[in-house]
Amino acid sequence: METKLPPASTPTSPSSPGLSPVPPPDKVDGFSRRSLRRARPRRSHSSSQFRYQSNQQELTPLPLLKDVPASELHELLSRKLAQCGVMFDFLDCVADLKGKEVKRAALNELVECVGCTRGVLIEPVYPDIIRMISVNIFRTLPPSENPEFDPEEDEPNLEPSWPHLQLVYEFFLRFLESPDFQPSVAKRYVDQKFVLMLLELFDSEDPREREYLKTILHRVYGKFLGLRAYIRKQCNHIFLRFIYELEHFNGVAELLEILGSIINGFALPLKTEHKQFLVRVLIPLHSVKSLSVFHAQLAYCVVQFLEKDATLTEHVIRGLLKYWPKTCTQKEVMFLGEMEEILDVIEPSQFVKIQEPLFKQVARCVSSPHFQVAERALYFWNNEYILSLIEDNCHTVLPAVFGTLYQVSKEHWNQTIVSLIYNVLKTFMEMNGKLFDELTASYKLEKQQEQQKAQERQELWRGLEELRLRRLQGTQGAKEAPVPRPTPQVAASGGQS
C-alpha cells in the first residue's frame, strides 16, 4: 500500500558566499587565542566545490527537444543528459554564469519532456539518465560546522548548488512517476549500491533536499519490489547507529515518515522481522536527546504497529515506561502525548495488562512541580475512550492514583492544576462513590498513622537528645569534682629508740 507524499516546495535560491582569504604561512599564528564566545554561524557551504571541473569546455545551447524530428530525439536527449552532467562551482557567484544558465535551461527542458512527452523513455537512455542523476546528487556531505547543532534553533547549511540540484531531483522524481517508466529495465542501474548512496544523502542539512529524497525513496520502494527488504534493512542500520554511536543524523524524521507508510501496508500477520524492528529500533529511539525533531513521525509508526497487531501493546507501553524521561520535562510531555495516542487504539483486553504500572507513572506525572507535565497527564481524563477504560477498571486504576491526586490537590502551587484535580476526583466520585469513600477514609487513616509515627519518632529523638544531655552533664560534673588526696601513714615507733 502506497501513501501519496506531498511534493516538495520550490524555494528560492540562496545567496552563495565567496571563499575566505587564506593568510600566508609566515603570518599564521600557531598559538592564537580561542574566543570563549560562541562563533557566529557561517553561511552555506557544500562539498560541491570539490566536484567542480576546472578544465571543462564551455557549454553551448543545444536545439530544443520539441524542435527536432522524432528520429533525432533520443540522440539529442543523450547529448542534453551529458551536458547536464557537467558540474559548476556555486561558491563563486560570478564564475561560469553562461554555462550555469545553459545547464539550468537544459534541466528545465528535461523535466518538462519526461513529464509530458510519451515514448521518450526507451531502454538505451536509461544508463545516461542514471549517470546524469548520480553525477549530480551523489557527493561527500561536508561535516557540520556546529557540533552542537540544534535543528529547532540553529539555521541549517543550505546547498549552494540547489538551483541545479533541485531540477535534477525533480527530473528524477518525474522519471520514476512517468507512465513509460520500466522498473524491469531500471533495476539494472538502480541497485543496492545506488540505494545505499541515496540513503546516505538523508544526512544533508538542507531540508529541501531531504524533502525530495523522502519522496524519491518512497517511489523507489514502491517501484522496485526486489529492493524493499534491503531498504528496510539499511534504515534499521541507520537508526541503530544513530541511537548507539553517532547520536546525529539529519534525516531521521524523513526516514520515519517513509516507514510510517510502509508499516501501514504490512500484510497480516506481521513477520517476526517487523516485530523486532518495533521492539529493538523504534522503542529505543525514544531515548535519543533530539527526540523532539522526529517524535511525531516516531509516534505515528508505533501507533501503526499497534493497529496492525494489538498483542504488541504491552511490549510498547512497558518499553516507553522503561525509557520514560526523568529530568527533561519537554520529553515527558511528548511521552504523555504519545501514550494518549496509544490508549486511543488499545484493546480493552490489553489495557488490563498494563493499567497498574501505566497509571502509577501517570500519577507521578500529576505530582510533577512542572505544571505542563501535570496538566498533560490530567488531560487523560478528558478523553472519552480512556475514561471508559478507567471506568471499567476503576477498582485498579483509582487506588493507583487516588493518594497522589488527593495530596497534590492540597499542596500544588498552580491553581489550574488544583482545579483539574478536583474535576478528576469528582469524576471518580461519580464513577464509584462507595470505592471513593473507602479510599478517602483509608487515605485519611493512613495520614493519621503517618502523623502518629512522625510524632513518635520526634519523641524518640527528643528522649535520645535528653539522654545525651544528661550524660554530658554527668561527665562534666565528674570532671569538676575535687579528687581526694591520700592520707599518709605514720610509722608506729612504739617508744623504741
Curated annotation (Swiss-Prot):
<feature type="modified residue" description="Phosphoserine">
    <location>
        <position position="35"/>
    </location>
</feature>
<comment type="subunit">
    <text>Component of the serine/threonine-protein phosphatase 2A complex (PP2A). This complex consists of a common heterodimeric core enzyme, composed of a 36 kDa catalytic subunit (subunit C) and a 65 kDa constant scaffold subunit (PR65 or subunit A), that associates with a variety of regulatory subunits. Proteins that associate with the core dimer include three families of regulatory subunits B (the R2/B/PR55/B55, R3/B''/PR72/PR130/PR59 and R5/B'/B56 families), the 48 kDa variable regulatory subunit, viral proteins, and cell signaling molecules. Interacts with SGO1. Interacts with AKT1.</text>
</comment>
<dbReference type="GO" id="GO:0031334">
    <property type="term" value="P:positive regulation of protein-containing complex assembly"/>
</dbReference>
<keyword id="KW-0832">Ubl conjugation</keyword>
<feature type="modified residue" description="Phosphoserine">
    <location>
        <position position="48"/>
    </location>
</feature>
<dbReference type="InterPro" id="IPR011989">
    <property type="entry name" value="ARM-like"/>
</dbReference>
<dbReference type="GO" id="GO:0019888">
    <property type="term" value="F:protein phosphatase regulator activity"/>
</dbReference>
<dbReference type="InterPro" id="IPR002554">
    <property type="entry name" value="PP2A_B56"/>
</dbReference>
<dbReference type="GO" id="GO:0071363">
    <property type="term" value="P:cellular response to growth factor stimulus"/>
</dbReference>
<feature type="modified residue" description="Phosphoserine">
    <location>
        <position position="44"/>
    </location>
</feature>
<keyword id="KW-0597">Phosphoprotein</keyword>
<feature type="modified residue" description="Phosphoserine">
    <location>
        <position position="47"/>
    </location>
</feature>
<feature type="compositionally biased region" description="Low complexity">
    <location>
        <begin position="1"/>
        <end position="19"/>
    </location>
</feature>
<feature type="region of interest" description="Disordered">
    <location>
        <begin position="473"/>
        <end position="497"/>
    </location>
</feature>
<dbReference type="GO" id="GO:0051388">
    <property type="term" value="P:positive regulation of neurotrophin TRK receptor signaling pathway"/>
</dbReference>
<dbReference type="GO" id="GO:0007165">
    <property type="term" value="P:signal transduction"/>
</dbReference>
<dbReference type="GO" id="GO:0010976">
    <property type="term" value="P:positive regulation of neuron projection development"/>
</dbReference>
<dbReference type="GO" id="GO:0005737">
    <property type="term" value="C:cytoplasm"/>
</dbReference>
<comment type="similarity">
    <text>Belongs to the phosphatase 2A regulatory subunit B56 family.</text>
</comment>
<dbReference type="GO" id="GO:0045944">
    <property type="term" value="P:positive regulation of transcription by RNA polymerase II"/>
</dbReference>
<dbReference type="GO" id="GO:0070317">
    <property type="term" value="P:negative regulation of G0 to G1 transition"/>
</dbReference>
<feature type="modified residue" description="Phosphoserine">
    <location>
        <position position="32"/>
    </location>
</feature>
<feature type="compositionally biased region" description="Basic residues">
    <location>
        <begin position="34"/>
        <end position="45"/>
    </location>
</feature>
<dbReference type="InterPro" id="IPR016024">
    <property type="entry name" value="ARM-type_fold"/>
</dbReference>
<dbReference type="GO" id="GO:0000159">
    <property type="term" value="C:protein phosphatase type 2A complex"/>
</dbReference>
<keyword id="KW-0963">Cytoplasm</keyword>
<feature type="modified residue" description="Phosphoserine">
    <location>
        <position position="46"/>
    </location>
</feature>
<protein>
    <recommendedName>
        <fullName>Serine/threonine-protein phosphatase 2A 56 kDa regulatory subunit beta isoform</fullName>
    </recommendedName>
</protein>
<comment type="function">
    <text>As the regulatory component of the serine/threonine-protein phosphatase 2A (PP2A) holoenzyme, modulates substrate specificity, subcellular localization, and responsiveness to phosphorylation. The phosphorylated form mediates the interaction between PP2A and AKT1, leading to AKT1 dephosphorylation.</text>
</comment>
<dbReference type="Pfam" id="PF01603">
    <property type="entry name" value="B56"/>
</dbReference>
<feature type="region of interest" description="Disordered">
    <location>
        <begin position="1"/>
        <end position="55"/>
    </location>
</feature>
<dbReference type="GO" id="GO:0051726">
    <property type="term" value="P:regulation of cell cycle"/>
</dbReference>
